[in-house]
């Protein structure tokens, strides 16, 4: 069987289990001629267990208007906000600290995001997460010194 020709790649961040044909999902998929209802049903079924999180999805659209999608891990920023128990990061992160996480929480988040991080091991992944935390005004406790 010949490979299908790819006509589009759509990246979206949608609440898990709550995709609807309303914007932003409908217009993004409609522009590529994808069956929106079919996608929303498939996405909601695939993300049902992760309700409450935002789950990024990469949708590959083919020439015959069929599609497949790959789920990513939730954004590091959202996982950090949940771990710190806060609503949003700081507007001026290097002056106002809005919360704190421990190094172990950074390692836990790095383990969750392992396949999407560009790191060789969990320690390096945790360092990436810690950097994200600092840029959001979240203090990292017990972090190893460089």
Swiss-Prot record:
Is Ribonucleoprotein one of the keywords? yes
Asked if the record carries the keyword RNA-binding, the reply is yes
Task: For this entry, list what GO says about its biological process.
Answer: translation
Origin superkingdom: Bacteria
Keywords of this entry: Methylation, Ribonucleoprotein, Ribosomal protein, RNA-binding, rRNA-binding
Residues annotated as transmembrane: none
Any GO molecular function: large ribosomal subunit rRNA binding
Entry-linked Pfam families? Ribosomal_L11, Ribosomal_L11_N
One term under GO cellular component: cytosolic large ribosomal subunit
What does the UniProt record tell us about how this protein is modified after translation? One or more lysine residues are methylated.
How this chain assembles, per its entry, is:
Part of the ribosomal stalk of the 50S ribosomal subunit. Interacts with L10 and the large rRNA to form the base of the stalk. L10 forms an elongated spine to which L12 dimers bind in a sequential fashion forming a multimeric L10(L12)X complex.
Q: What does this protein do?
A: Forms part of the ribosomal stalk which helps the ribosome interact with GTP-bound translation factors.
The family assignment reads:
Belongs to the universal ribosomal protein uL11 family.
| Record protein name field | Large ribosomal subunit protein uL11
